[in-house]
């Protein structure tokens, strides 16, 4: 576990959240706000006022929040480029599946590029959406580079959630819907962070609502923690992590300004800590994948470990604090989930 306090934290410099995407999402078939799960036992154990978990394990027919960003980015792009016939995206799994799903809904083709170490279950889920699947001989960043080349072809659109393109910005705007659904106020928000698009949306919410936002990253892919410490986007080596959706070497340029100003600090967790959190949530009847469970692992470290004292003080975490955990995904790799929790994915989870 590593903790970083952001020396450049300045919520007044954060952009306001987009309100336009929520109206669009509400028009989609099957849209409903995802549930907020209270965790009173955890709050009592850690000496906090309240803890709640935003459960993104079932969002518009998919097991992750990513469809909020992908659907809005595609909608905005097609308004400008109605001639597009193929959507292209690089992904560690969830974003690609979301883009493929949106393509199928809109009668478009999809070409999804995945890194070599992507799990077979995630590949199969994307293929099941009808997409052309390309496994790149390299890491996530190699897939991103190939997607940019493929997306530049005639009739193609790269739906990127990283970089500085229009879609990369619209993805951040689309994620605002997750936070506009909250019906209560929180003091501290812990958000799993890969390239930082969701964390940027969280930062916008936090700046508006007066909540401190903490980024949660894998120890093995802590590109935002490195960037906050350096004061500039910093690429890191990524040897691999079970938190596949967070296995990113650099933050998105579209997200960076709001991350730098709006993230109070960061906590890194390792795979063992994320898996322990998965087991804890499974015991409560909540089927949450590695990336989503990382938020719980980070809260435990933040609330109890001596090394986290500077960040605890910076965000004012204490007996009256109301804490929100963003559980970004359900089990997207069933075999890995079973190995981590000792059981198959719960059905009809609370």
PLM regions and their residue ranges:
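PLP-dependent amino-acid enzyme catalytic core
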Residues: 1-350
């Amino acid at each position: 576990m590593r903790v970083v306090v952001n020396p450049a934290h300045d919520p007044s410099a954060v952009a306001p959240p987009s309100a336009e995407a929520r109206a669009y999402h509400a028009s989609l078939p099957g849209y409903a706000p995802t549930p907020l799960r209270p965790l009173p036992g955890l709050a009592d154990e850690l000496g906090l006022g309240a803890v709640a978990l935003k459960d993104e394990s079932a969002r518009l027919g998919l097991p992750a929040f990513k469809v909020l960003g992908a659907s809005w980015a595609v909608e905005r792009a097609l308004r400008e480029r109605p001639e597009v016939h193929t959507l292209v995206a690089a992904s560690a799994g969830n974003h690609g599946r979301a883009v493929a799903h949106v393509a199928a809904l809109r009668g478009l083709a999809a070409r999804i590029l995945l890194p070599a170490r992507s799990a077979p279950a995630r590949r199969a889920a994307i293929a099941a959406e009808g997409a052309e699947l390309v496994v790149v001989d390299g890491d996530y960043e190699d897939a991103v580079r190939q997607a940019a080349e493929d997306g530049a072809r005639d009739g193609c659109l790269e739906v990127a959630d990283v970089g500085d393109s229009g879609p990369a910005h619209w993805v951040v705007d689309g994620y605002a819907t997750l936070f506009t659904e909250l019906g209560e106020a929180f003091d501290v928000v812990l958000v799993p962070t890969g390239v930082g698009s969701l964390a940027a949306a969280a930062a916008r919410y936090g700046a508006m609502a007066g909540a401190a936002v903490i980024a949660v990253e894998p120890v093995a892919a802590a590109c935002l923690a490195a960037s906050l410490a350096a004061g500039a986007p910093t690429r890191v080596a990524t040897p691999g992590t079970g938190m596949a959706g967070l296995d990113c070497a650099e933050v998105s340029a579209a997200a960076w300004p709001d991350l730098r100003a709006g993230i109070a600090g960061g906590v890194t967790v390792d795979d063992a800590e994320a898996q322990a959190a998965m087991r804890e949530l499974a015991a409560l009847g909540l089927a949450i994948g590695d990336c989503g469970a990382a938020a719980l692992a980070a809260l435990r470290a933040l609330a109890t470990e001596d090394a986290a004292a500077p960040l605890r003080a910076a965000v004012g975490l204490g007996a009256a604090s109301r804490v929100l955990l963003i559980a970004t995904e359900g089990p997207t790799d069933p075999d890995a989930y079973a190995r981590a929790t000792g059981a198959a994915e719960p059905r009809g989870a609370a």
